[in-house]
Amino acid sequence: MTELSPKYNPAEVEAGRYQKWLDADVFKPSGDQKAKPYSIVIPPPNVTGKLHLGHAWDTTLQDIIIRQKRMQGFDTLWLPGMDHAGIATQAKVEERLREQGISRYDLGRDKFLDKVWEWKDEYATTIKEQWGKMGLSVDYSRERFTLDEGLSKAVRKVFVDLYKKGWIYRGEFIINWDPAARTALSDIEVVHKDVEGAFYHMNYMLEDGSRALQVATTRPETMFGDVAVAVNPEDPRYKDLIGKHVLLPIVNKLIPIVGDEHADPEFGTGVVKITPAHDPNDFEVGQRHNLPQVNVMNDDGTMNELAGDFAGMDRFEARQATVAKLEELGALVNIEKRVHSVGHSERSGAVVEPRLSTQWFVKMDELAKQAMDNQETDDRVDFYPPRFNDTFLQWMENVHDWVISRQLWWGHQIPAWYNAEGEIYVGEEAPEGDGWTQDEDVLDTWFSSALWPFSTMGWPDTDSEDFKRYFPTSTLVTGYDIIFFWVSRMIFQSLEFTERQPFQNVLIHGLIRDEEGRKMSKSLGNGIDPMDVIEKYGADSLRWFLSNGSAPGQDVRFSYEKMDASWNFINKIWNISRYILMNNEGLTLEEAESNVAKVAASEAGNVTDQWILHNLNETIAKVTENFDKFEFGVAGHILYNFIWEEFANWYVELTKEVLYSDNEAEKVITRSVLLYTLDKILRLLHPIMPFVTEEIYAQYAQGSIVTAAYPTVTPAFENEAAHKGVESLKDFIRAVRNARAEVNVAPSKPITILVKTADSELEDFFNSNINYIKRFTNPEKLEISSAIAAPELAMTSIITGAEIYLPLADLLNVEEELARLDKELAKWQKELDMVGKKLGNERFVANAKPEVVQKEKDKQADYQAKYDATQERIVEMHKLVK
């Protein structure tokens, strides 16, 4: 047995430990076919950069689950991997190239992809280093990447099979277009923001010049693509105009007036300009009336030749130029400033442009119905917390067809080929013969991610060992912000292609926020690098904070104050472990277990030993129960209270009565209970704080705590009598301590303690444990009896079954104490007067910085609280001498 360092140093504790675990292969599945399998696939992080605090939280929760299940004897697999993250990664690489004055088009597709693979290798290495520093117990022998050949094969099969069923189709529709990334986006890749904008009101003159129809738009630059104006066929103001024409300003082209219910008589003038190539509602109107589709923009957001003199202008530049021209022509009625919601690309931040485009889509109605129906069966996915099942169902009910093609080079190239005759071939392999050209677009990243739980297990080879043993997976851990992006798609793809749920449980966590409750973001500059936190506090402290503040579905606020508390808790564990091991005298864990069995059988030990084992039993039961419900925060609070309050503050202190005695037999038993309880504590804590628990465990045990058995309840430890007795003993000691503190009597001063109880069992218990009472209360005189008479002047504390009297004559001189309190009251009044004068100065309040004023207000509140407490103490003292 070696000795723990005098001071807890997380850098020393954690250095090299992860590599030792990897070298020992302790993270791989046990291979025990008799054991029940338990599997998790890691939500693959994007290879776009370093991991953030949200990733740290997400992976910590997974590691807690898998470490506990491993210790419980499950055949565990935690499969790691990363996502190619098409648009995000390509944007990063293009940004790096732009700094060198190079575009992807300068390189060409193949050389550009070489650059992206270099990026992927660089950041994949960084991510794995971060996983190591976090202590994640993943099985690297099964590491996957969404562009691996095995996963690519699965992607091609799914695409081809859905195409053959008619559930993947190619069509021309209005989609969300990112002009910066030059690619289509799905609805959920669009972030809507309220921005300052305007409604531009314009007059379109009837062809005979008799009157004008007023239309309004937020995007006047699209008017070059107007092909009609629409009015409601039931609107009496305009129904006679249906079939006539108006003159499109600037372009001087006649366009028809159509009757369509899309035009709302109650909104604006009731007249709507129709631009089928640039608005989804207008597209549908165009379909109903067989209108042409005129696209007036290039894919980079500039105007094309159909915009006439405005060709080549950026769309926003063209907006201002168009408005100026309309004003010059007298066609601009007015500009109405208004805040409105505008879609932005989640990745590039560019304003999204609704644009007519030929894309590939997944038909969603049958897939969504299948997913919703499955939630009514025994094979349903259980959400934690359950309310997210409703969220999932609502999204599925309102789902649109999914645009899956992206105008990128990085990703799974669509397995479709075209020839000069206009034929399309879709297959897992390229068609035979010459003259075929593969579609240049790639699939949406989420298309391959949706297959992650089963493609990583070897599917479409359903005979693969991993697929047969570990699929469906057991639990998915993810944030509520990607339930629709990812969770729902995994569910419907898994049901379609494996006829099974992808996972049994989904644990939903919230977001990491800063101390003020704001979402962490680059724009706010409030992001926290988890590696910086680990460098200062250690991985275990970060993991304890992340788990201890965790409740399913809830957000967590990060603060350094909480990190300090986490470090302090681990330091406490370190110190009590060091104390126990230094007093261990060579006792082995096996010997301790044998001696503890004697305590449970009441053959050895004392009531405090029985009490701590009883409470340990309860702690094991409650922690295990809450782990099973993914209530890690609740489990953490239970552990914290048991370790710090019951074990360290009480039991360890109580054992000093034995350890400092001459009774060698009792010492052995006490050391045994200390070591045994410490061992169980470390095992309970290990899933949350793996490094420090391994370091301490290695001081007294063989092997790794990673594969040590997780604690279970021992029925023989149940002892309500011991529990009740020691709790009464604690109440007694607390009552005396509180009374001393109330009248400022030092613990070192001996006092008289009189205890009156009519409970003979309690009297016997106190008398039989008189040494503990004396050690913790320091009495000069101690009497415990049913015949005690209450002194005339005494502090009285009532506990269950007894009254405790502390005669005032032993405690203090009341007159002197009142004089001292009067002085203290005057001091706080003086402080209140000073700060009150400052805050009463209007010039100070008006001119000082807000934080300075707030500091004075905080002082005032603090002084007032101290004044009130002192005054209350004076009142209590007067009561005592009446």
UniProtKB/Swiss-Prot annotation:
Pfam families: Anticodon_1, tRNA-synt_1, Val_tRNA-synt_C. SUPFAM superfamilies: Anticodon-binding domain of a subclass of class I aminoacyl-tRNA synthetases (SSF47323), Nucleotidylyl transferase (SSF52374), tRNA-binding arm (SSF46589), ValRS/IleRS/LeuRS editing domain (SSF50677). Monomer. Belongs to the class-I aminoacyl-tRNA synthetase family. ValS type 1 subfamily. Its main location: cytoplasm. This is Valine--tRNA ligase. It comes from Streptococcus pyogenes serotype M6 (strain ATCC BAA-946 / MGAS10394). ValRS has two distinct active sites: one for aminoacylation and one for editing. The misactivated threonine is translocated from the active site to the editing site. The C-terminal coiled-coil domain is crucial for aminoacylation activity. The lineage of its organism: Bacteria, Bacillati, Bacillota, Bacilli, Lactobacillales. Keywords: Aminoacyl-tRNA synthetase, ATP-binding, Coiled coil, Cytoplasm, Ligase, Nucleotide-binding, Protein biosynthesis. GO terms for molecular function: aminoacyl-tRNA deacylase activity; ATP binding; valine-tRNA ligase activity. It is an enzyme of class 6 (ligase). The keyword ATP-binding applies. Catalyzes the attachment of valine to tRNA(Val). As ValRS can inadvertently accommodate and process structurally similar amino acids such as threonine, to avoid such errors, it has a 'posttransfer' editing activity that hydrolyzes mischarged Thr-tRNA(Val) in a tRNA-dependent manner. It is found in: Cytoplasm. Its EC number is 6.1.1.9.
